[in-house]
Amino acid sequence: GGGRRSGNRFFNCHSSHGVVDMNKAIAQSCDSYFYHFAQAVGFDQVADMASLFGMGKQFDLPVNSQFFGTVPNAAWKEKKFGRPWEPFDTVNASIGQGYYLASPLQLAVLSARLATGKALNPRLVMDGPAKDPMAYDFRPDDIAYIRQAMSDVVNGAGTARRAQLPLPDVKMAGKTGTAQVVSLSISDGRSGPWKYRDHGLFVFFAPFDNPRYAGAVVIEHGGGSGSAYPIARDVMTFLFDPQKGLEALRALEQQWGGTAQQRLEQRYAAYAAARGSTVKPPPRREEEIFDQVEAEARLAARQSEAIATDAIKPRGETSSVATPPSPAATPATEAPATPAPSATPPSVVPETTP
């Protein structure tokens, strides 16, 4: 493949692309293109634009575990390490490597802002209607150009052609990414020990020409973006056509050995059987769950009434209310007879404002 030299180091590109413009560089993920132009404009300008699109930011959400990440520049490196910014730092950071750190939420916000040209922020649906976001001072033609380039990643001669939606009227746009974990001298990133494999990333939005949803998928040690974009494809398929999305899920579940609930039940039963116990099957319908909860509540109420009656009677007088017997002690080898845990539903990607 191609690449670019910086000092005594040569930075590779994963392939040779020939003559490249921005559209082709985005669609085919040409690292050399971004190496060149980051050095041409200076990385401080690149870092400023990354911050504008949500990198390194905290959002107004009721969670304490947000990860700020890092958008490096010359001032940041000087403050943190006491060393100047070098040309090879620009090359590394131009494709998100080196000191760059980002969270999946930040990547999803980046995707939404790129798609719309507006300063969209994530919010909880129950917070009510979203405020009108500020529009960036971008030319409409520039926004349309980026949308088309990211559409070509999926629907053209790009790096995520297998991410095309099975929907004739909806096209998804995206960008593949690979976060290198260790040096290529240790691992090629695609195989070998799991801990040395690259992380797979994919940011996306759809429909590409009138965005409604945007999101990001990160698969740690997935070996590259090929582990990430099929998930984005299936999620977006479900959002636009739930029936078709569930059909794709059922085909996968057959390979996995059943639904998530069925696999959990099988593992739970095997765990109990290994300890000489059995488990009752969990309720199958909402009505059964409600009936079970109400029965337990009635039993608890009767026990409370019996205890209260005994407490107010004179000493020596026995209660006419029979207290239900305490449950027998569970043998040490018996597993709790509780329903198998329910599967957790997948997260839904943030909704953008067209």
Task: Walk through the language-model features, giving the residues of each.
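Long, low-complexity, intrinsically disordered segments
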Residues: S304-P354
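Beta-lactam-recognizing serine transpeptidase/beta-lactamase-like catalytic domain environment
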Residues: G1-V217, R267-R275, L299, T309-S319, ...
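N-terminal non-cleavable signal-anchor helices
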Residues: P72, E253, K280, E294, ...
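A generic structural motif
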Residues: I219-G223
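Short, gly/Ser/Thr-rich active-site loops of penicillin-recognizing serine hydrolases
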Residues: A130-M134, R147-Q148, Y229-R315
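Intrinsically disordered, low-complexity acidic/polar segments
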Residues: R212, G224-G226
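Short amphipathic alpha-helical face segments that pack within enzyme cores
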Residues: S103-V109, S227-D234
